[in-house]
A protein has these predicted regions:
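A short alpha-helical cap/connector motif
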Residues: 1-152, 156-221
């Protein structure tokens, strides 16, 4: 795998749109490497021809068009640091953000997800906190590197967790920063994000190129 710091430094020298495309290309190369070399990842991969809802051909739990627009939003808002809740099976969003920003701090409940990614960590670019995002210890750890320019909540999608994560982490974002929730369109028993959006009075805007996913965000005032 390519050394991350020199790659990040090269990407940071590019204009935003080119930087995003290079970072996404590296993400896709990484995904191909993962699928070709790691049987444990292959077991998690779902062919989109079989199940489009639960799959992604780039091994990233995002809709590409939505991710591109979100990355453009972050860079356009001078985002240098971000807190992400949820590393995911493949850590693909975390990986992209680590190439584009000065520092990313991600909270992940599942130690197995952390263990899969731990060999790729560059501590000058990224921090991963392992634990329940709603626990006092984890929140206090996140505060150690606050304030952030943005927060992206994409962890446990139950109503209770999304509401608590929003309440706990929005205050760690600077004024003028971005507070974002993933799966903003996904209505269902396990997905409480749309309900949280409806119940809060923030000036929500939405990045949506799919019926099932979507990213909702507001600018902190």
């Amino acid at each position: 795998m390519t050394e991350k710091l020199p790659l990040r430094n090269y990407i940071k020298e590019q204009q935003n749109k080119l930087a995003i495309q290079v970072a996404l290309h590296m993400m896709e190369m990484r995904a191909e490497h993962i699928l070709n070399s790691n049987d444990s990842y292959k077991d998690l991969y779902i062919d989109p021809k079989v199940d489009i809802i639960n799959s992604n051909p780039q091994v990233i739990q995002q809709v590409r068009e939505e991710l591109v627009e979100f990355l453009e939003l972050l860079l356009g808002n001078n985002t240098k640091t971000i807190l992400q809740v949820g590393l995911g099976h493949f850590a693909s969003t975390h990986f992209v953000l680590s190439l584009l920003l000065d520092h990313i701090c991600t909270i992940e409940y599942d130690k197995l997800h952390f263990d899969r990614y731990s060999g790729e960590i560059n501590t000058s670019l990224e921090t991963i906190i392992v634990g329940d995002s709603t626990s006092t210890e984890v929140i206090d750890n996140a505060k150690q590197t606050a304030p952030f320019d943005a927060v992206f909540i994409d962890g446990n999608h139950s109503y209770e967790y999304v509401k608590k994560d929003l309440d706990n982490y929005k205050d760690l974002v600077r004024v003028g920063g971005i507070v974002a929730l993933h799966d903003a369109n996904f209505e269902g028993e396990r997905y409480g994000t749309p309900q949280v959006i409806r119940e809060t009075s923030h000036d929500w805007k939405k990045i949506s190129h799919s019926n099932e996913v979507g990213i909702a965000y507001f600018i902190k005032v």
